[in-house]
A protein has these predicted regions:
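Structural/interface elements that position substrates and couple domains in central-metabolism enzymes
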Residues: 1-261
Length: 261
């Protein structure tokens, strides 16, 4: 209750740390998340160490430099629940380490499980769509992050491919993706994974809404926030990116569900 919260806040007020007032279930889960993450960090460092030793690399030097990066490596970055990772770097480099470790007979169970965990997250998104029982699915955001046209190993492309394979009618809009402009490996990837993508693309959010019943938001492109104002009654919105966190959006008027919230 509010009175107890004030008493506890006063007791801890001298400590150089913020005080959060939460429900007991979130407070308890934070402890589990803390300790699970610490265990993951220990296991990660040890797996890097085993791999480094097998390749004649000094893991102490590697990790001493690794921890200097407080923008990405040791930071809040990548630590918010959302959709699966993708792009031209993370999947490729993780597979490279895993492949080389197998050649050297070095066991890296945690890193080997990361790709499968990522695929499971894509399957989870597919199951969320399936549970609505609608066949006309719109996808906002084809690339793995906002403000890029890089489609290589985008988890959204994988999700779309699986939806099409299961007979869903898919429409796509991405403000950054113009098919005639795609080049090289990027163009080859999307044409291989979704051969008829040109027929699926819409020219605007409005057009996509007119042709679909369920909308999946794949990245946090600013333009996609308009779905919370322009949606038709009955639209379901599945948020994979956290775009619904924007302060000026009214989620009370839409049928909205986040992938992890």
């Amino acid at each position: 209750d509010e009175c107890s919260a004030k008493v506890l806040a006063h007791l801890y007020s001298e400590l150089p740390a913020p005080v959060f007032q939460l429900r007991p279930r979130e407070a308890a889960m934070i402890k589990y998340a803390d300790n699970a993450f610490h265990a993951v960090k220990v296991s990660f460092a040890n797996e890097i160490g085993r791999f480094c030793k097998a390749t004649n690399v000094d893991s102490r030097i590697v990790m001493d430099v690794f921890i200097q990066d407080t923008k990405l490596n040791l930071s809040p970055y990548y630590l918010k629940p959302g959709f699966a990772f993708g792009g031209s770097c993370l999947p490729k480099d993780l597979r490279a380490v895993s492949h080389r470790a197998k050649q050297l007979d070095v066991s890296l169970p945690m890193m080997n499980a990361v790709i499968e965990s990522n695929q499971e997250h894509i399957r989870h998104a597919l199951e969320m769509v399936r549970e609505y029982g609608r066949k006309r699915i719109g996808v906002l955001g084809l690339s793995f992050k906002a403000d890029t046209d890089d489609l290589r190993e985008s988890p959204m492309v994988s999700l779309i491919e699986q939806l099409i394979g299961k007979g869903y009618e898919v429409k796509i809009y991405d403000t950054n993706v113009t098919l005639p402009r795609l080049m090289g490996a990027n163009k080859e990837f999307i044409e291989r994974e979704v051969p008829h993508i040109a027929k699926l693309m819409c020219l605007s959010v409005k057009e996509l809404l007119e042709k679909t019943d369920v909308v999946v938001v794949g990245n946090r492109g600013k333009e996609y926030e308009s779905i919370f104002r322009e949606h038709r009654n009955g639209h379901r919105i599945i948020d994979l990116s956290g775009i619904g966190e924007a302060k000026d959006l009214n989620l009370d008027e839409v049928k909205y569900e986040g992938i992890c919230w």
